[in-house]
Amino acid sequence: MNEFQLKYGCNPNQKPSRIFMADGSDLPVEILNGRPGYINFLDAFNGYQLVKELKKATGLPAATSFKHVSPAGAAVGLPLTDVEKKIYWVDEAIGELSPIACAYARARGADRMSSFGDFISLSDVCDVAIAKLIQHEVSDGIVAPGYEPEALEILKAKKKGNYNIIKIDPEYKPEPIERKQVFGVTFEQGRNEFVIDKELLSNVVTENKEITESAKIDMIIALITLKYTQSNSVCYVKNGQAIGIGAGQQSRIHCTRLAGQKADNWYLRQNPKVLNLPFKDGVGRADRDNAIDLYIGDEYEDILNDWERVFTEKPSVFTVEEKKEWLAGNTDVTIGSDAFFPFGDNIERAYKSGVKYVAQPGGSVRDDQVIETANKHGMAMCFTGMRLFHH
C-alpha cells in the first residue's frame, strides 16, 4: 500500500486528503483497526520518531502521549512507585507492569488534562499490560512496531470497535530530504538527524560540574522530547519522565512558566490531601482529573462550591502556604530548552519548580547572566550548542 485515503485534512472542509509515498514505494505502516485521520498520522509519525530515538539513546523502552502534534508526556520504562500508580490511575488488577507499560503510564500520567484523547506511540511491542491501561483511557489511537494478539483484541474493542491501531515498520528509514508546501510554495530541508546522547552533555558551564547518571538520562529525555515539540518549547523531567512540557509559545519565559506550572501540578497531585480526596463511587477518570486540576489550582472555589457533584464530603482548602511547603520538596528536576535562555528569569522560574540540572544550546548575548543565575542556585548547566526548533 503506497497510498491511504483520509476522510479529510486538518478540518472537515479540507478535501481531498491522503498520505502517500511520492516514490511509489509502500507506506511504512499497516492499519490494523479504525480509520486514522490527518492529525492522527502527524501525531503517530512524530511520536514514533521520539520514542525510537529515546530507546536508542537510553536503552530503555519508551512511550509518548501526543496531542495536536506535540507531546503531552514522554517517558522511559522505569518502575512506578505506589504513589505514582495512584496518581496515574493504575488499576492494581492489571498486575505487574512491564517496562514498556510503565513508560506509557508515566507518559500518559504526567499531564492527564492534556493527554485526554491522545495518540500513543510505543518504541516496543504493545503488550497486554499496556492494552489494559489504555482500555480505560480516552484515546484516539496508537502506533507501535507490533502487538501481542491478546493486546490487539483488547484495543480493537475500544471506541465501539473503531479505535485507531497502526503498526509501523521499525526498519523504515525515511529519505534524507523533507518537503512540504505552504501557500503553494514548496519548502525543502534536510531531515533533523542530529543525534542526542550523553556526549552532547560534556560542556558544563557552571561552577557545579556534577551531573548524575540519572540526571543525564533526564537531560536526554528532555532534549529528544523537545526535538519533536512545536517551538518554542521547554521541558521539565524527573525520574525518567517529562513532568511538564510547554509547547508552541512565542516567548521563552512563557514556555518556562507553562511547563513549570505543569510540573508543579504533577507534584501537587502527590500530596496526601489530593491523594485522599473523597470521590464518590462512579465518578469517571476525566471528571476526577478535572476536579483535581481545579482543586490544586487558583480556581479551587469552583470545585469546592460544587463539591457534592463529585465528592462524598467537602474537602478543606489546599492553601497557598500548604502548596508552597509541599512544592519545596520537589528537588533534582531537570529542565531542557529547544533554544537558548535569553535572560536569567527563566532560571529563576525553573528553580521554583525544583530544577537542579539544565540543558540548553547557549548562545545568548546574556549567557553570562544566565550562568550567574544558575550558579546562584547551585545548578549544573550544560550548553549543547544545538538548537532544536520544530515546526
Residue ranges and their predicted role:
Residues A57-S65, I165-I168, S231-K238, L268-F279, ...:
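Flexible, glycine/charged-enriched surface loops at secondary-structure junctions
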Residues P61-A62, K67-A72, V76-L78, S233, ...:
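Glycine-rich phosphate/pyrophosphate-binding loops
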Residues A72-R112, I243-F340:
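Glycine- and Gly-Pro-enriched alpha-helical subdomains that act as flexible
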Residues E53, Y228, N265-R269, K352, ...:
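Conserved helix-loop functional segments at active or binding sites
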Residues S70, C126, N239-Q241, Q249, ...:
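Active-site-proximal loop/turn and secondary-structure-junction residues that shape catalytic pockets
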Residues M1-L200, A215-S233:
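Active-site loops and adjacent core secondary-structure elements that bind or stabilize anionic groups
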Residues D118, L122-S123, D127, H136-I166, ...:
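C-terminal binding/interaction regions
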